[in-house]
Regions:
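Accessory, non-ATPase domains that flank or precede helicase/AAA+ motor cores in DNA-metabolism machines
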Residues: 2-396, 408-424, 706, 733, ...
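Non-catalytic terminal extensions of ATP-dependent helicases
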Residues: 8-140, 185-186, 196-200, 254-262, ...
Length: 774
């Protein structure tokens, strides 16, 4: 069996290891014996929650040769669905009379290259997810149905083979019989072929009326591949010594797999390194894939790439229409797009001639999908690069502890950019204790003075608070009522524009109350601050200065966001106000002061990654200051200014702080020195969620005793957020020192879970390498 085949069957059929382990694909057969068939069996992955493939016979009417990676329309229960072919075989557990035939072959060739196909198989195995849903995730929405890849050409195919009965029925219709023979002999013909052969439209229509011939829409010819640039761009910047070393080192393996961690302080010129490496790949006719964590980064990134390169650049992210995403997917697959830039799902972009994959801001948790197929785009990018045999670059000023440990283990190559590029100097950091201060909408007088000083000098200021909305809480001063989401165990956030109460967890929107629903008092007040409330305060405090709020609420319009970016890049005095979105890779050379209003949230997080993420956010947002010759300063407000974590961040580098955290993780045997998996249930009642997890826990006991798996377990327990979107949530956390052991354990566990009868309305999921345990 070759590597393009999925060696899987029936219930949960895969097991796999991370990059340093070989992927083992096991064939798990049901208890009944397999039956040898004289003809071919086609195994199809269908989008369903079942971890298995399904056996079909080839189409009744001979069509194009069927290959792995092609879409087919098949009967599934009482409906027809679109699946993806994964392999052909000679045996099945089903008797011949129980097998159904494939209805239609939808593609002329596989939609996935061999390398991408194998990456998807690895992903289904590693993340313990149904293979049919994995393939569906990898396809644009329009290709998840019967839509052809590119609709342009009408063709005609025979529906029923020309046998004796058909031949007899057409004995008096010689033209129809002759045309039917032509179409059958060539499999499919277009209208020009029919016309040139001397047949009329009337004859063709008669065959279609008799259901002997059917019309299909198929893909047009491929677009021409991009033309490689013949010279370097005039916009190419000179490199410093560290950048030169990075470029030279990576180019040594420019035509083979290697994973590099480009660890550069903010403003060190990582993007220029990317671009010069891309220039080399484009000159050799190879495509490049660039992943960014947020849609908000895409306009700025795309603009810089299009200014720099004359070759076509396409964009792929969830903000595009289905038609636009399919168009970008086609250009990438055909090789007419030189550079594909996108967010998480762009890791599945097909590349005709791949040359390099870049993951910018590799530490960002946005690269991990939080529902459905819970994959990490960063980790998939590394595995895909390995399958494609191309280099992959993970860039960050605050690398994840996982990537740093992979460097220490010699799995990744560590390249450092320790100085800012050009004349830019690192900003100065100041920690301000506000525990005894009287604040005005979250600002100390000391901070307001510094803001005014920078604005008077015609500079720009960035104010950071990781809380969107107007205020995080609406409460009644008379009885203590608090506005809570009736679908979640969470408070509703007050929003001023548009006015209302919103749940940031499930999306519930309610009208803004004018009186307390408990005691009817009108004595309601908002507590806490969010970006909208701060925006109003800053506009009143600095009435002549533009205040640009950049958060998930304000940038829903791409045009509005691009307008704000243009205004910022003019380097006129303004105040940027935003959430975590502003910390990610933006280059704003006019900013000389960064203000962090509240740095305390990550200090007391229930998540073991809380301190790492807090350090990354503060370091990243601090890096927005001083990116030109004007210098910069960072003011961090805290009620716990003496806390060891904050003191370490201010007095040392991120690298030193990360080393400290790695030692803590090693001592506590937490990732990256172990592997976690999260089993979660959602049900209408908490009892049902916990009871089902208890059944899973009993299976785990049995596996641990009989198979000698060393797996630590926490739970079953209610999730920290017990109710979300109307469902009660329970969880069971698994931990193992060995990925090999964890994968084999999950493989067998998922088999047995699928054999359980889950209560109506209950859903269960497995999250391998979870980044959110809340």
């Amino acid at each position: 069996m070759n590597e393009r085949q999925v060696v899987c069957y029936d219930v949960c059929i895969y097991t796999a290891m991370l990059s340093r382990f070989k992927v083992f694909l096991k064939k798990s057969m049901p208890l009944n014996e397999t039956i040898k068939h004289h003809g071919l069996i086609i195994r199809v992955a269908i989008p369903s929650p079942l971890r298995r493939v399904f056996d079909y016979l080839p189409p009744i009417v001979e069509q194009l040769s069927i290959k792995p990676g092609m879409r087919v329309r098949v009967p599934f229960g009482k409906r027809e669905v679109v699946g993806v072919v994964v392999e052909s075989a000679q045996d099945s557990t089903l008797l011949p009379n129980r097998l159904k035939s494939i209805g239609t072959v939808l593609d002329r060739e596989p939609l996935f290259s061999s390398a991408l196909f194998r990456t998807l198989l690895w992903a289904a195995a590693y993340y313990q997810h149904p293979i049919g849903e994995v393939f569906q995730t990898a396809l644009p929405v329009k290709l998840r149905s019967t839509e052809p890849v590119k609709v342009d050409t009408t063709v005609y195919r025979v529906l029923i083979p020309l046998d004796g009965d058909i031949s007899t029925s057409l004995k008096q219709a010689k033209k129809q019989k002759s045309l039917l023979e032509l179409i059958e002999s060539e499999f499919e013909v277009n209208e020009n072929r029919i016309k040139n052969a001397g047949y009329s439209r009337r004859t063709l229509n008669q065959l279609m009326e008799k259901n002997l011939v059917k019309r299909y829409m198929v893909a047009s010819e491929r677009a021409a591949k991009f033309k490689p640039p013949t010279s370097a761009s005039e916009l190419q910047l000179p490199l410093n010594d560290a950048q030169k070393v990075a470029v030279k080192t990576i180019l040594k393996s420019s035509d083979s797999y290697a994973c590099y961690l480009l660890d550069g302080v903010t403003g060190s010129g990582k993007t220029e390194v990317y671009m010069q490496l891309i220039q080399h790949q484009l000159a050799n006719g190879r495509q490049c894939l660039v992943l960014v964590p947020e849609i908000g980064l895409t306009p700025q990134t795309v603009s810089r790439f299009r200014e720099r390169f004359t070759c076509p650049v396409v964009v792929m992210h969830s903000g595009l229409s289905d038609a636009a995403r399919l168009d970008a997917w086609n250009h990438s697959r055909e090789g007419s797009a030189a550079i594909t830039i996108g967010t998480r799902s762009a890791v599945f972009a097909p590349l005709a001639n791949p040359g390099m994959i870049i993951v910018d801001e590799e530490h960002d948790t946005s690269f991990k999908q939080q529902d459905g197929f819970r994959y990490s785009a960063r980790d998939l990018a590394v595995m895909r690069a390995k399958k494609e045999n191309v280099p992959v670059i993970l860039g960050s000023a605050t690398p994840s502890l996982e990537s740093l440990q992979n460097c220490k283990a010699n799995k990744f190559k560590h390249l450092r950019l320790g100085e800012r590029a050009g004349v830019a100097q690192p900003p100065t950091l100041e920690l301000v204790d506000i525990s005894q201060s009287i604040l005005e909408s979250g600002f100390s007088e000391q901070l307001l003075f510094k803001i005014q000083k920078q604005l008077n000098a015609n500079n720009q200021v960035l104010v950071f608070i990781n809380r969107r909305g107007f205020a995080p809480m609406l409460t009644c001063n008379s009885c203590g009522w608090i506005a809570e989401c009736n679908q979640c165990i969470a408070q509703l956030t007050v929003h001023a524009k548009p006015p209302g109460l919103r749940c940031h967890h499930c999306g519930t929107i309610e009208k803004l109350s004018t009186s307390c629903p408990t005691c009817n008092s009108s004595n309601l007040t908002t507590l806490g601050i969010g970006t909208q409330k701060i925006e109003l305060f800053l506009k009143k405090r600095f009435p002549l200065i533009p205040v640009l709020r950049i958060d998930g609420d304000s940038i829903r319009s791409r045009k509005r966001f691009e307008t704000m970016l243009e205004q910022i890049n003019r380097r006129e005095p303004c105040i940027l106000l935003g959430t975590q979105m502003l910390t990610k890779g933006h280059h704003f050379p006019g900013i000389t002061l960064v203000a962090v209003l509240d740095a305390d949230a990550g200090l007391f997080s229930a998540d073991f990654r809380g301190q790492e993420q807090m350090a990354q956010i503060i370091t990243q947002v601090s890096g927005r200051a001083g990116r030109s010759d004007r210098g910069g300063q960072v003011v961090i407000q805290s009620r716990h200014a003496g806390h060891q974590t904050l003191q370490s961040l201010v007095q040392s580098t991120y690298a030193e702080f990360a080393d400290f955290l790695l030692k803590e993780r090693k001592n506590s045997a937490m990732p990256p020195f172990s592997q976690l998996a999260l089993l979660r249930t959602e049900a209408k009642e908490m009892k049902a969620a916990i009871d089902f997890l208890s059944s899973i826990n009993s299976i785990s006991d049995d596996l641990s005793i009989n198979k000698q798996f060393e797996i630590d377990r926490i739970g079953p327990i209610p999730a920290p957020m017990e109710k979300r979107a109307g469902k009660f949530r329970g969880q069971l956390i698994l931990k193992s020192a060995s990925r090999l052991v964890m994968q084999e354990f999950l493989f067998q566990l998922c088999q047995r879970i699928e054999a359980l009868r889950a209560p109506a309305g209950l859903r269960w999921s497995v999250d391998v390498d979870p980044v959110d345990l809340i």
